[in-house]
Amino acid sequence: MWSESRIEALTPTLAPTPTPHYERTMTGFLKVEKLAKAYQADKPVFADVSFDIAKGEFVCIIGHSGCGKTTILNVLAGLDTASSGNAFMDGREIAGPSLSRGVVFQGHALMPWLTVRQNIAFAVQSRWPDMRRADLNAHVEKFVALVGLSHAIDKKPSQLSGGMKQRVGIARAFSIQPKMLLLDEPFGALDALTRGTIQDELMSIVGQTRQTVFMITHDVDEAILLADRILLMSNGVEVDGHYKPGGIAETVINTLPRSRTRAQLHHLDGYYDLRNYIVDFLVSRATAH
């Protein structure tokens, strides 16, 4: 099947695993060790969550609402703390927010009184307070252009559509050149056409920058399109009077060619096998066992 733990069971009809576009390491650029979070001592939302992400790797996490995906992302962002366990990035333990990690949430979180240029410049100046004005403007304009918003650079958020606001958020996150990008369902509130367009832009930027990305999504096709690996997360469940916390149940390797596009995705050999495997997990196996 598709999980790393069951890779030996791959059938001959499935697409062969291509050479990854990143170099995998034993330690990982990001390392999560036995992470757990409990709001009630006897019922942790998740427990024993461990995974690595290699530098330049794009990893998506999928699971039902309430399983703890956003909590994990918030711990990685330094916005929340785990009940137990540790998370390390580039050899250092994560302890609080840092400009080395860019975060994009489902809501755009732009300052409404500032223009697109000023919103992004504010972030850039936080990272490089001594940057000259000319260099600052050039830097901001570069990342605004990457998301196709040069024509709207001097507009305020109230003058932008929802999709344009999300593009600004993505440009702002990339503009501080973080070591890692954390995305919490960044396209979840957008219509299908806008979502597809921004997915294309994200793939292009990630390809240019070789950015390391950890992304939450509920969209199976989105995960297959974007990710090198997909973490499948289970919900906690009561079994025979005992509570079993959720966690990372399976890790799926995306064997489709890295050069895939939205238009060709469903034509690729192995696409439906991969999609059906993930959907089957969500329907039949997404509880702790």
Q: Residues of each region from the PLM?
A:
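Helix-to-loop junction immediately C-terminal to a conserved catalytic motif
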Residues: 77
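The feature captures the beta-strand-to-loop junction immediately N-terminal to the Walker
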Residues: 62-64
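Conserved ABC transporter NBD signature motif
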Residues: 85-97
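Conserved signature/switch motifs of ABC ATPase nucleotide-binding domains
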Residues: 155-158, 176
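Conserved ABC ATPase "signature" region
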Residues: 132-152, 204
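Short coil-to-helix segment of the ABC ATPase nucleotide-binding domain corresponding to the Q-loop/switch region
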Residues: 114-123
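Catalytic Walker B motif of ABC-type/P-loop ATPase nucleotide-binding domains
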Residues: 181-184
